[in-house]
């Protein structure tokens, strides 16, 4: 449960050099924020691209800030696939969230069919470019490489596969954004990460 997870993260101990952020469904954001120490961030799993208006069911960055939530996950593959969110919409969401003072975990990743067709880099670059076309300040953006075929399936990209994509993304940032952003931006891997495999994944340079 969320309460049990909060207890684990509160008692730790957590590495002081590691930033920890917990992504929660919207109804539990306040609960998680109230039970976690300030050193652990809380992220919403979605928000909309405008501050206010007639958008029934949507959550704005302003609402998240009212709950003292500092992070939001945007562009998750399930939002892209199930809810039909385009790269342009996701980029608009990211720009607005950043402008409102939130930090963003921006998700990219390929499907199994795209990987088998050797389109992994092309897909990841296209999704990243849609964001880069609109984002000018990357200091509060984390890129999350989440191959669709590894999310909730029990299949995990090998550390070598993840490193290959992360290195390619860093090179893309050097060539298309700037060397400074490329060296500074955090690129994390997500997709069936467990206690058994996290250390090996984290040991990779990118």
Swiss-Prot record:
One of its GO terms (cellular component) is cytosol. It comes from Culex pipiens. CDD domains: TIM. This is Triosephosphate isomerase. Belongs to the triosephosphate isomerase family. The active site is at 76 (electrophile), 146 (proton acceptor). It comes from the Eukaryota. The gene is Tpi. Pathway: Carbohydrate biosynthesis; gluconeogenesis; Carbohydrate degradation; glycolysis; D-glyceraldehyde 3-phosphate from glycerone phosphate: step 1/1. Keywords: Gluconeogenesis, Glycolysis, Isomerase. It catalyses: D-glyceraldehyde 3-phosphate = dihydroxyacetone phosphate. It holds the Pfam family TIM. GO terms for biological process: gluconeogenesis; glyceraldehyde-3-phosphate biosynthetic process; glycerol catabolic process; glycolytic process.
């Amino acid at each position: 449960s969320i309460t049990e997870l909060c207890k684990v993260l509160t008692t730790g101990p957590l590495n002081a050099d590691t930033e920890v952020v917990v992504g929660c469904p919207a109804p539990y954001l306040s609960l998680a924020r109230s039970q976690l120490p300030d050193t652990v961030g809380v992220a919403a799993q979605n928000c909309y691209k405008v501050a206010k208006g007639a958008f029934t069911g949507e959550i704005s960055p302003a609402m998240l800030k009212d709950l003292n939530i500092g992070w939001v996950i945007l562009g998750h593959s399930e939002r892209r696939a199930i809810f039909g969110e385009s790269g342009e919409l996701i980029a608009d969401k990211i720009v607005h969230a950043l402008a409102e003072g939130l930090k963003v975990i921006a998700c990219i990743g390929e499907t199994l069919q795209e990987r088998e067709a050797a389109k992994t880099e092309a897909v990841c670059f296209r999704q990243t470019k849609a964001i880069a076309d609109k984002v000018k300040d990357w200091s509060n953006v984390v890129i999350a490489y989440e191959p669709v075929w590894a999310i909730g399936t029990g299949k995990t990209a090998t550390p070598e596969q993840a490193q290959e994509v992360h290195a390619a993304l860093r090179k893309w940032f050097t060539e298309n954004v700037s060397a400074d952003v490329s060296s500074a931006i955090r690129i994390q891997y997500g997709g069936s990460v467990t206690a058994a495999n996290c250390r090996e994944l984290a040991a990779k340079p990118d």
